[in-house]
């Protein structure tokens, strides 16, 4: 199996079109505890370097820049409801504050 950190570096570039100088582990979470044992590891990417996306032909991923405050507002107003995304944003905000690090 591919080490988690190497997978995270690879997935970052493939899906966002960015590389980074370092990744910091933030948290792990289980997606559907009662249904399966799938776990997701969340990392924080720092010092992003533009690269190129390498998407599957059926994938469409648009990358946008958002402040932590704006992301939290989407959560609080019910406009962002994906549980893993909400958990990652709130964990980041709790650890680094609204302005990030």
Predicted segment positions?
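Short secondary-structure boundary/hinge segments and terminal tails
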Residues: 31, 92-93
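C-terminal boundary of histidine-terminating zinc-finger modules
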Residues: 89
């Amino acid at each position: 199996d591919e080490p988690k950190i190497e997978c995270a570096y690879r997935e970052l570039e493939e899906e966002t079109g960015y590389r980074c100088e370092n990744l910091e582990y933030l948290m792990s979470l289980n997606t559907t505890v009662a249904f399966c044992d799938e776990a997701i590891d969340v990392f924080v990417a720092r010092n992003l370097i533009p690269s190129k996306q390498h998407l599957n032909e059926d994938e469409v991923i648009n990358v946008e820049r958002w402040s932590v405050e704006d992301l939290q507002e989407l959560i609080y107003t019910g406009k962002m409801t994906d549980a893993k995304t909400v958990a990652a944003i709130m964990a980041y905000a709790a650890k680094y504050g609204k302005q990030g690090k």
